[in-house]
């Protein structure tokens, strides 16, 4: 037996738990079970043949490379934006804070069309980058740009609350003891931010793995070059090859779950270490 706290916001523990479990079953477990059922139609040899297909492997490489570059960029830029929004007061700060959520509200197709227009050869950014012989559209770099744009809020919104709770007092105390601003950031602030920053980058990476709408507009679907796994899955579905689509999706799903589980484990160990101190 276990005791349930009497201070409840929602009426009824049984009703709340039942509703939550129903949501988990309908939204998470049923789709995953459908994926498993599709995979069950394939033998191990057929499954291996699908995921080891050279074109599929090329799509995995493009997807992982682009998602990695996008998540690293988001880690740096997202930390910078979170720092600016929490440590400084300036005109337009509220607007800038609201704009950080724009990728969440903007349809990915609209985001992709906008990015394609900006980075095209005649676009605002593309024309300038062309002077340095840098092409973004219909390259893996364009995929990374689309992924970074759609997933940047994960880093900002994960790091920002931690920075607000941390406050500038710790930095000021370190500086009064003789530390430079860079030393106070690296030795005082960054260790406290690391769990949130790593979690934000991991969420950005896993979100990027499944990006579809923005990618297809800025990078197209060029086999061996800009074909990512989400586009390949879409093509397989159009061909009514559901087992093959499920097999390709299962690899990305496994990678995402392993990454998220690893991050949660590291955060849990970090939390126990902090409590132990």
Pin down the residues of each PLM region.
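Membrane-topology segments of multi-pass transport proteins
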Residues: 1-7, 48
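Membrane-water interface segments at the C-terminal ends of transmembrane alpha-helices
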Residues: 8-43, 52-164, 188-213, 217, ...
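Short hydrophobic, aromatic-rich alpha-helical segments embedded in or entering the lipid bilayer
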Residues: 45-52, 223-237
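Membrane-helix/interface signature in polytopic inner-membrane proteins
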Residues: 158-172, 180-181
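Key positions in alpha-helical "signaling/recognition" and NTPase switch elements
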Residues: 173-174, 245
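Glycine/proline-centered hinge or cleavage motifs at structural transition points of membrane proteins
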Residues: 177-178, 191
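Conserved acidic donor-binding loop of glycosyltransferase catalytic domains
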Residues: 184-185
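Short cytosolic juxtamembrane segments of multi-pass membrane proteins
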Residues: 267-277
